[in-house]
């Protein structure tokens, strides 16, 4: 490692420790030439993810832009910003796990919506209204119905014992 004082490349590591929640290693070094002590960091180099927008334009993934949009949709819901930062970090990890250099904004929007539905229904509706470009009340109603159906399906699956036979019967009533 190059010494910042004398530019010598000969140094020794005095101490190493994990930093930034395990995403980097902090090393304390000493130059063998001038005995100057300095700190270096080793970080994982993530894939550069390119977002393909609806209009076909491409831009680099901007974690802070995603966070701003999610914070806006979660205003006055009582969700802490630190929780939202962790939420965005999870999304970034998921995107990195796909090992794709390019991903559509639609894919990211769907990932966000699937995760928001478990956190806040209000935030889900707000995010969906911007992401899906709602044109009127019908779009809100359709999304609310979809969210309600998802919730009912989850509740139904949670009450059904595993490995049991289920017989569903539909009653039709003519009025």
Swiss-Prot record:
Coiled coil, from the record: none
Its biological purpose: Negatively regulates transcription of bacterial ribonucleotide reductase nrd genes and operons by binding to NrdR-boxes.
Family: Belongs to the NrdR family.
Gene that specifies this protein: nrdR
Protein name: Transcriptional repressor NrdR
Residues in ATP-cone domain copies: 49-139
InterPro entries according to UniProt: ATP-cone_dom, NrdR-like_N, RNR_NrdR-like
GO molecular-function terms, A-Z: ATP binding; DNA binding; zinc ion binding
GO-annotated biological processes: negative regulation of DNA-templated transcription
Cofactor(s) it depends on: Zn(2+)
Signal peptide coordinates: none
NCBIfam families, sorted: transcriptional regulator NrdR (TIGR00244)
Zn finger intervals (unnamed): 3-34
UniProt entry tagged with the keyword DNA repair: no
Entry keyword annotation includes Transferase: no
Keywords: ATP-binding, DNA-binding, Metal-binding, Nucleotide-binding, Repressor, Transcription, Transcription regulation, Zinc, Zinc-finger
Top-level division of the source organism's lineage: Bacteria
Cofactor binding notes: Binds 1 zinc ion.
């Amino acid at each position: 490692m190059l010494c910042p004082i004398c530019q010598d490349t000969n140094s020794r590591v005095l101490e190493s420790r994990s930093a930034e929640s395990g995403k980097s290693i902090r090393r304390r070094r000493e130059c063998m030439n001038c005995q100057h002590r300095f700190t270096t960091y080793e970080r994982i180099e993530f894939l550069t993810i390119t977002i393909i927008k609806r209009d076909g334009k491409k831009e680099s993934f901007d974690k802070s832009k995603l966070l701003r949009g999610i914070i806006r949709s979660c205003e006055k819901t009582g969700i802490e910003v630190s929780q939202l930062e962790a939420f965005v970090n999870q999304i970034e990890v998921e995107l990195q796990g796909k090992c794709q250099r390019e991903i559509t904004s639609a894919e990211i929007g769907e990932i966000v919506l699937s995760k928001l539905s478990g956190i806040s229904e209000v935030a889900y509706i707000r995010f969906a209204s911007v992401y899906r470009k709602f044109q009127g009340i019908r779009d809100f109603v359709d999304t609310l119905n979809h969210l309600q159906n998802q919730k009912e399906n989850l509740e139904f699956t949670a009450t059904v014992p595993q490995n049991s036979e289920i017989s569903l019967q539909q009653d039709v009533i003519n009025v």
